Each structure stands twice: as structure tokens, then as C-alpha cells.
Amino acid sequence: RRQRQMCIRDSPSFKAIIYYRIAHKLYEGKHYFWARWVSQKGARKTGIEIHPGARIGKGLFIDHGNGVIIGETAIVGDNVTLYQGVTLGGTGKEHGKRHPTLCNNVMVSAGAKVLGSFTIGENSKIGAGSVVLEEVPPNSTVVGVPGRVVKRNNQSVPREDMNQIDLPNPVLEDIQRLQHLSLIHISEPTRHAQI
């Protein structure tokens, strides 16, 4: 009993989820002003901003939640874990569903940004500081900017699939092609003069 009281009194994450649940009920009842009022009060007190229109399942755990943002059309499944500084945001380009869907048992590490209307498959992990802009298959691990799948079903993805060092450089390729053409052009008159 004492631990529960300490949890309620001391945990900003727990308080943020309580504020969200109240605001979401108001939002579903079309009491938008009061829903936003409760939501903003919760954000000011906890540092965690959860839009009352977001749909969140059971067992959400926000660890060290300062700076967590969950957008209006985000859908969060059951038993999801979010760490500090996570954003489930939109790109601002879509109408309607603009935010991501996180399936059950997803973990999003500190500072990761998941931006856009797509799905993160169940049991997936998003690495710290990653920026995810596209669909993630179930049972995957994603890291980097932009986010790339480095593990699927607990098996590493082949290195050539995630090579970020030897990326094509179209500008350099064009310069090399032009240099080659200029060398051919320079050598042609000499060849004609010898004939």
C-alpha cells in the first residue's frame, strides 16, 4: 500500500497517464475544451504531453518521461515502453491519421523520434536517438538516422543491407563521367591528326 502511495505521489509518468485517461474520456465525450485543459495541466505538471485524442492500450510504461510527446492520432498498443524524449509525431503533410501506430510490446528508447502515419510492428525495439520515418516489421530492431532495421526475428541483417558508409554519390559520379568525356574529347583530335 505504501509503495502504491509513493508511486502516485512521486511518479510523473504515472500521473501523466492518469491525466491522459481523464482527458481521453472527456475527448471521447466531445468535451474538447475540458479535454485539452486537463491534458495541458498534466503536461505542465509532468513534462509529458499526451494528446487526449491519442489511443493508448493497457500497460503503457513511460520511464524517465520528461519530454515525451504523443500526438493526436497516435495509437499505442498494450505493454509499450517509452523512454525520455520520445516523440510519436506527425510530419505535418497528411490529413486524417498523421501519427504512428505502435503495436503491442514495442520499446522506444531515449530521444527516438517516430514521425508519420505508419506502423511499428509488435515486439520491435527502436534504438536511442533514432529517427524512424517508415514502417517497421514485427520483431525488428531499428537504429540510426534515418532508422534502419538491423535485426529481424533476433537475427542480424546482412551488413551490406545496412551499409551507410559506401552510399552512392551521384554528384561525384557525374563529375567523373564528365572528366572521362573531356579526356576522350581531348584525345580524339590527336588520333585524327595521326591518320
Can you annotate each of these PLM segments?
Residues 17, 33, 75, 170-173:
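Charged, alpha-helix-enriched surfaces in structured cytosolic catalytic cores
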Residues 43-150:
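Structural signal for interior beta-strand "rungs" in well-ordered beta-sheet cores
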Residues 97-109, 113-114, 145-183, 187, ...:
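C-terminal segments of enzyme domains that contribute to small-molecule binding surfaces
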Residues 3-7, 188-190, 195:
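Short, small-residue-biased leader/transition segments that mark boundaries at the very start
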Residues 12, 135-137, 190:
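Short, proline-centered helix/strand-breaking motifs
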Residues 2-45:
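A transmembrane-helix-recognition feature enriched in membrane-embedded lipid enzymes
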